[in-house]
Amino acid sequence: MVALTPLGIAALALLAERPMHPYEMYQLLIQRREDRVVKVRRGSLYHAVDRLLEQGLAAVRGTERAGNRPERTSYEITDAGRERLGGTIAELLATPVNEYPRFPLALGECHNLPRHEVIELLGARVALLQAELAEIEQLMASATARGVPRLYWVDVDYRATLLRTEISWLTATVADIASGDLPWLDSGAATFPHSPN
C-alpha cells in the first residue's frame, strides 16, 4: 500500500465533501488557505488525483462541459478511499513523526555565526512570524464572525498556538543571547567541552 502524500490526503478529503473536478479542488484549497499546510500546485494536484484513481481511492463521476470551455472530469471518493482517508488521518493524529524540519538544525548550528548576526536573524524571523500570526488571527476572527464552527479551522488555531509559542521562545532566547545569559563562542566566554572517548 502506497502512503498518501499530504496533497493526496487533502484531495481525498475534498472528494469526501462532494464530487468535484481538480480545478475546483485547487480553487478550494487556495480559498481555504490550505496552501499553508500542503504544497499546492495545479499540476501536482492533477497528478495526485491520478494516483488516487490508480489506487482505487477515487473514481470518475462524470464529464461536463460549460459553454466553450474544455471538458472537465469530476471525481468522487470510493468506499476504499473513505476507509483509507480515515485510517491515514487517525494514524497522523495519534503518532508523532519527526518530519526533520530545518529550523531546529539551524538553531543547533547557529553557534557558527557571530552573536550579533544571530540576534539580527532571529529578530527578523520573529517579525515574519508575528506577521503570519496577525494574518491567522484575522482569519480566525473572520471565521468566528461568519459562524464557521471551530472544528473546520482547528488546524489554524493549532498553527496560531505554535506561532505564539515560537515567538515567545525566540524573544526570550534573543534576550538571553543579547544579555550574555546565553554565552556565545565569539565572546570567548563559552567553549565546547571535549567528550572523553
What name fits each language-model region?
Residues 1-98:
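Basic helix-turn-helix/winged-helix DNA-binding cores
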Residues 122, 129-143, 163, 170:
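Non-transmembrane amphipathic alpha-helical segments
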Residues 137-156:
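Acidic interhelical loop/turn segments
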Residues 86-134:
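Amphipathic alpha-helical dimerization/coiled-coil segments
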Residues 17, 47, 124, 158-165:
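DHp/HisKA dimerization-phosphoacceptor four-helix bundle of two-component histidine kinases
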Residues 178-192:
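Long amphipathic alpha-helical coiled-coil segments
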Residues 160-179:
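Short, contiguous alpha-helical
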